[in-house]
Amino acid sequence: MNIRTLEPDDWPALAPFLHAHNVASARCLHSHTGTTAAAYRQELAALAPDEACFIIAEFEPSCAGVMGAEFSLESKRAWLRGPVLDATLSSAVATEVRDALWRRLSDVLPAAIERLDGFLDISNVAGLEWYRRCGFTEQAHYFIYEAQRGPASPMMPDNVHAAAESQHASLLELAHLVFPSGYLTDSELTAANNDQHVLLVMAEGDRVDGYVYANIANANTDDAEVYVDYLVVRPDARGRKLGRTLLQAALSWGFSERGVSKAALTVASDNANAQGLYASVGFKLFATGVPMRLDRGANSIKTTHSN
């Protein structure tokens, strides 16, 4: 078996393999970037070379498996992709390939990364068991919802707007209050809106009562979608339908302004109120995700063959 760390120019070539094998009961949700090889290829090509890495396992001349990660040095976190394996591998060989990929990935990830997060479909039993054997702990589950654009796209509410610079302090205070371990950095939350992402707020003066952050995934492909990363309402402002209004704003931006035909979001499995909101505007359950987490320490990284 040959293990290689890929150069960024080689990442898009992984698309056909990932499209073929990241499916059904073997799915890694961090790796799921669309329903076509073209969507995978475009997303891989768009990754920042200094914020990701990919490892490939080969039994010449064929690819046996892929594992990678996106990472942020600012937040000291990495979001793992895979391992995604050739579905024809035996159980014993699959374990060998997973271990080899993990050993190399552990070596090439920046030493500054302290927290590693995997995210597998709940039906990926073999993958989840492997993560547990490597020392990862299972976190609370999440539901992934999807919605299709209807014949009439929602209008942008008049009381929703981009955050002013004077509102950034309140915005960040709210983000840290509600999602202290959120994956978006302060600089990402306060960056200027563009064609790829938007952050919109509802506020009274400089006090932000709620915000929504959304991005366009797989732009310019048939799998383009508006993904709602965060929908946040200040605890003492709840009950005023701010969440519904902010969600409408995100869908208006994605459907009307950016012209995509699909939306997606993730919600905690125990957040019944949010699930009810999403269902009421047409979102349907796509998958149940199981987060797996490892905080790196001197002895925290191991493989299934470690004692």
For every predicted segment, state its role:
Residues I122-A140, R244, S269-A287:
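Conserved active-site alpha-helix within GNAT-family acetyltransferase domains
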Residues N2-L18, D158-L171:
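A short beta-loop-alpha structural element at the N-terminal edge
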Residues L18, N22, C28-F54, F179-L200, ...:
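Active-site rim helix/loop that mediates acceptor-substrate recognition in acyltransferases
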Residues E129, R133-L174:
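Acyltransferase donor/substrate-recognition loop-hinge adjacent to the catalytic core
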Residues S91-D107, R133, Y230-V233, G239-S252, ...:
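Conserved acetyl-CoA-binding loop-helix of GNAT-fold acetyltransferases
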Residues D186-W253:
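Glycine/small-residue-rich hydrophobic helix-like segments
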Residues L29-A100, V212-D229:
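Conserved donor-binding loop and adjoining core beta-sheet/short helix segment
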Residues L85, L116-G127, A264-Q275, M292-A298:
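Conserved beta-strand-loop-alpha-helix junction that forms the acyl-donor binding cleft
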